[in-house]
């Protein structure tokens, strides 16, 4: 698919979700090795992602910490960051659509003696699923002080209004939502071009973009289900979805350093990867939003 137009896919949410789930199921054993979960060498302290995000969240948290707070991690994958929040003192519930990922997360929590609840659901149905888990005795609470999502998350969702409604539904009054994710301005670039060249859409129109890739962002190995679908979401769509759900935006930032190597031209620096030289200041690679439920 050399032509960006060939990547446009008019698929239903159900079809796209099924393909993505198969792909993410395949990623679990690869990521267990890549993160050090399989070997037991995963860092004993906080993950790099959570270390960064906790510092960014601190000014908006009571006492500057998640200690003693109920935290729900949307799209938690194999739980490495969720377990880090538990190590920081939060009472955690992880939400993800992959049963294999949640089984891995549960094993990780047990290995380190961390208490955590895990809820299998599409994040677009998170509120009802967490309430059901509470009713079954599988989760301690359906109301949270913090809802968190970070890095490589919302591109897998087709409906941000519905996503934001789930966040608002599980937050307590005064509760905090935090997201740090890849910026759509970066995703619109050709990652293999010799310069910063926009070839994909920045704005979305409801259609997905289709990708076929046997690799993944971490670890060695290949996936059997190579096809995935992603939806572009400009920053304005993210912010307006949260406002529309009744949340108050307290902070918006854009960043130049990414926790993974989006392009082979990116340089590894302290804290992640960035474009080389003066290109670093030309386009954001991440955005961060902090919002609160009144």
Which residues fall in each region the model found?
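N-terminal, positively charged/glycine-rich alpha-helical extensions of SAM-dependent methyltransferases
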Residues: 1-40
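Conserved alpha-helix/loop element of class I SAM-dependent methyltransferases that forms part
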Residues: 36-69
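Class I SAM-dependent methyltransferase SAM/SAH-binding core
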Residues: 69-129
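A short acidic, Gly/Pro-enriched loop at the edge of an enzyme's catalytic core
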Residues: 128-147
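A short SAM/SAH-binding and catalytic strip from SAM-dependent methyltransferases
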Residues: 145-161
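A short glycine-rich, Lys/Arg-flanked "PGG" loop and its adjoining helix->strand segment in the class I
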Residues: 161-176
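Conserved class I S-adenosyl-L-methionine
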Residues: 176-216
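Short alpha-helix
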Residues: 228-252
């Amino acid at each position: 698919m050399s032509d960006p137009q060939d990547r446009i896919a008019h698929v239903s949410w159900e079809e796209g979700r099924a393909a993505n789930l198969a792909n993410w199921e395949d990623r679990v054993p690869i990521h267990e090795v890549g993160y050090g979960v399989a070997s037991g060498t995963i860092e004993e302290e906080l993950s790099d992602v959570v270390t960064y995000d906790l510092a960014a969240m601190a000014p908006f948290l009571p006492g500057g910490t998640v200690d003693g707070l109920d935290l729900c991690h949307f799209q938690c994958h194999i739980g490495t960051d969720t377990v880090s929040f538990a190590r920081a003192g939060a009472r955690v519930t992880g939400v993800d659509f992959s049963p294999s990922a949640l089984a891995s997360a549960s094993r990780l929590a047990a290995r380190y003696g961390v208490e955590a609840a895990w809820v299998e659901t599409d994040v677009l149905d998170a509120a009802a699923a967490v309430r059901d888990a509470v009713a079954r005795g599988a989760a301690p609470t359906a109301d949270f002080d913090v809802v968190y999502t970070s890095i490589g998350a919302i591109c897998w969702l087709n409906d941000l209004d519905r996503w934001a409604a789930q966040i608002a539904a599980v937050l307590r009054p005064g509760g905090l939502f935090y997201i740090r994710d890849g910026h759509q301005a970066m995703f619109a670039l050709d990652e293999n071009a010799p310069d910063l060249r926009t070839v994909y859409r920045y704005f979305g129109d409801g259609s997905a973009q289709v990708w076929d890739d046997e690799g993944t962002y971490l670890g060695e190995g290949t996936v059997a289900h190579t096809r995935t679908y992603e939806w572009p979401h400009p920053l304005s769509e993210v912010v307006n979805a949260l406002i529309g759900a009744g949340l108050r935006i307290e902070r918006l930032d854009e960043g130049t350093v990414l926790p993974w190597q989006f392009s082979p031209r990116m340089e590894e620096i302290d804290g992640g990867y960035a474009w080389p030289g003066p290109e670093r200041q030309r386009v954001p690679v991440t955005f961060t939003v902090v919002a609160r439920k009144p």
